[in-house]
Amino acid sequence: MIDTTTTTTTTKAFGAKSEERRRRSTCGGGEKNHHHHFLKLSPCVNNLATALLTDAYQITMAYAYWKNNKHERIASFDVLFRKNPFGGEFTIFCGLEESLKFASNFRFAKEDIEYLKRCEFAKEMDPRFFDEYLAAVDCSQITIEGIKEGTVVFPRVPLVHVTGPLGVAQLLETTLLTLINYASLVATNAARHRLTAGDEAQLLEFGLRRAQGVDGGVSASRYAYVGGFDATSNCEAGRQFGIPVRGTHAHSFVQAHSKWEDIDGNKVGECEDFCGEAREMLKELREAMSSDKNSGSKNHGLCHFGETNESELISFCAYAIAFPNSFLALIDTYDTLKSGIPNYVAVALTLRKFGFQPVGVRIDSGDLSYLSLMVREFMVEAERCLELRGHPFAKGLAQKTKITASNDINETVLRELKQSGHSIDAFGIGTHLVTCLAQPALGCVYKLVEMDKKPRIKLSEDVEKVTIPGKKQCFRLYGKNGEPIVDVMLRENEKEPKVGERVLCRHPFIESKRAFVTPAKVEKLLLVCWDGKNGGCPREFYEESVGLEKSRLRVREQVKLMRTDHLRHTNPTPYKVSVSGDLYEFTHQLWLDNLPARELT
């Protein structure tokens, strides 16, 4: 399925143009609105992401607010999560761009209103709620602050902060969580795979067929790319987002060939009889390797191969004729070492003989560590033997051949391969990546933190579920070596931290955990990204921060900044998330004010 060919200049150009077209359409063709500095955005990529994509109780709550004339009172909500996924200590935030598109286009269509009126829960509801309120509702009074997409984030820190009329802000909850939860989970999963595989390996996403539905497949391709994957097999995702697309053939292609007559057209470049040349090459390869007395290989049986599967050779020739400059063969249909690799080498050498450059092989089953090492060793010996026979085109075969491995690869498999040793250049990863099999949900929540400018707190027997009240400022403080030290939350009107000035950082709930930090750099995390009153998304924020390639680059840069102990798989060190001294005192006082004292008898 996957081809590890390096992306051509044409592909890169197409990807860049595709991304630019997408961003221009997102900005409504780049036209300025009447405020000049704010943008009206295009709809979400998935046309199901509308105002109606919500839970019924959001409608009933909005009705109750409206019925009690509370719907226009100003409320603030935080989108946050409480625990990092996959047993790790970091998360990649994604989904902001789609959230802003959703806000930009939030309204109930006439047919949406008519449908809601027919719902069972609407029987007791005043029709004026639908005709006068829901029919006119939009995000023109909403303000959204968000962290830049692709940022490494941590529990409790708000990813998105929504302020506006209570009725509208409540109606945004379900869809915002839908757009952020899965996107952040997949991007985090992809980033973890990239960390485990290392920077040199190519990571190829091909989970479309295993994804949870059509949108699950397209979204997974998009956010896996943001998280650090190099390409996808998903053509629709490639078209939508300009992601490089790779692909070769499946086992069925090999099985579909049985006779040389199946190949219609045998000419490749200056080679008039490619199939005949490939058969002769296989014959010479067998003779050269079996008669070699100076083999450096410890696996003599590997080099002394017998008859290979002819139908497999036929299929390889057919594919090489179709794609002489990007030939990558799946070699495990019958027997990887006894048939697949000898057949591949014969066809690859024939291509090289006539001036073409084949790409490599893919292994989709078996012991990937052992097989990759044996495949590489076979090519080294084949190259040496053919060079001794005066064939200069064999030189470089082993070095330039890319070995791609697939077969239910996940983080654990990648670590085991690294420990045992392998010769794999690229990994095709599907099921475990797109389904997030290790953890199927991130668990973002949407919590009311302020009502009519008065902070609100949600209490729980589980201290992890206690919210940090009020509208907050959020900052990341960096040390002298450039690494982030702590994320700190402040009350809305507190003085911002400054470089070189000590900041008291306190654990939100444990009194004894506190420290002074003197930052060498201060980064503001929550930025205004939607200003409904002024007409939309701030142009400066959009142009500097939004876009697939910007988010992808941000992930790479941010992960490199983090201390390695925060990123490691085994017993990672939790990153510090703190509150200011003022916010700590306020939170705990509000906690006491809202917690009834027990009566003891």
Name these PLM-found stretches.
Residues S423-L442:
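Glycine-rich phosphate-binding active-site loops on the catalytic face of alpha/beta enzymes
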Residues H161, A329-Y334, P358-D367, K402-S406, ...:
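Catalytic beta/alpha-barrel core
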Residues V347, V361, L368-M374, F378, ...:
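Conserved structured catalytic cores and adjacent interaction surfaces
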Residues F323-L328, K353-V359, A394-T401:
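Short, surface-exposed connector motifs at secondary-structure boundaries
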Residues S339, I409-S423:
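Catalytic cores of alpha/beta
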Residues I147, R209-A211, I403-E411, G430-H432:
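Glycine-rich beta-to-alpha transition loops that act as phosphate-gripper elements at the mouths
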Residues C139, F378-S406, I424:
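Short beta-strand/loop segments at the ligand-binding rim of alpha/beta enzyme cores
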Residues I2-T4, A13-N325, K338, T350-R352, ...:
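Ordered alpha/beta subdomains of enzyme catalytic regions
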